[in-house]
């Protein structure tokens, strides 16, 4: 363990010394990925006013398309109600979950071949496993507290 700690400290010291020996400009340039073939670096004394006049100027109006821009709202209208794919069962319906899961498991024959069909099939398997786990948990809790249903809150 001590060997790894010494190795880690030596590695840290080597990288910090290497970064101290480099000029700061080189460190800055290394941290930014650049394409040198697309860039021409000129100093201030090399650029003349003739070169600037030969450059085509690109204004903001040239960059904007002249086509009509249509912006659609991502908000729902008030008359649209979101629909739940799987409604949340109420406490009274927890007892009949086995029959409900069998009713919702009816799929078309070719539905399992599509991605949506596979997703629906996996969702039904997860729901079935969750229902079984919930039923087993409730039975276990009832066995731990057999008289819990008889307890009434004091008023």
Swiss-Prot record:
Organism placement in taxonomy: Eukaryota, Metazoa, Chordata, Craniata, Vertebrata
Q: Which protein are we looking at?
A: Glycosylation-dependent cell adhesion molecule 1
Q: Which family does it belong to?
A: Belongs to the PP3/GlyCAM-1 family.
Alphabetically list the UniProt keywords: Glycoprotein, Phosphoprotein, Signal
Attached carbohydrates are found at: 34
Matches recorded under InterPro entries: GLYCAM-1
Q: Which Pfam family, giving just one, matches this sequence? A: GLYCAM-1
**Residues annotated with Phosphoserine modification:** 48, 53, 57, 59, 65
| Annotated gene | GLYCAM1
Query: GO cellular component terms?
Result: extracellular region
Q: In which tissues is it expressed?
A: Highly expressed in whey fraction of camel milk.
- Signal sequence span is 1-18
Region of interest called Disordered, as start-end residue ranges on this chain: 74-109
């Amino acid at each position: 363990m001590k060997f790894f700690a010494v190795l880690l400290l030596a590695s840290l010291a080597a990288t910090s010394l290497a970064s101290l020996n480099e000029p700061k400009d080189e460190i800055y340039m290394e941290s930014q990925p650049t394409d040198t073939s697309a860039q021409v670096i000129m100093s201030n004394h090399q650029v003349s006013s003739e070169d600037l006049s030969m450059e085509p100027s690109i204004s903001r109006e040239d960059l904007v398309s002249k086509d009509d821009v249509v912006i659609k709202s991502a908000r729902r209208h008030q008359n649209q109600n979101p629909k739940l794919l799987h409604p949340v069962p109420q406490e009274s319906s927890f007892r009949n979950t086995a029959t409900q899961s069998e009713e919702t498991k009816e799929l078309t024959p070719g539905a399992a071949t599509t991605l949506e069909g596979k997703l629906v099939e996996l969702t039904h398997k997860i729901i079935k496993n969750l229902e079984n786990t919930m039923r087993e948990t409730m039975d276990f809790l009832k066995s731990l507290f057999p008289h819990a249903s008889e307890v009434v809150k004091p008023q």
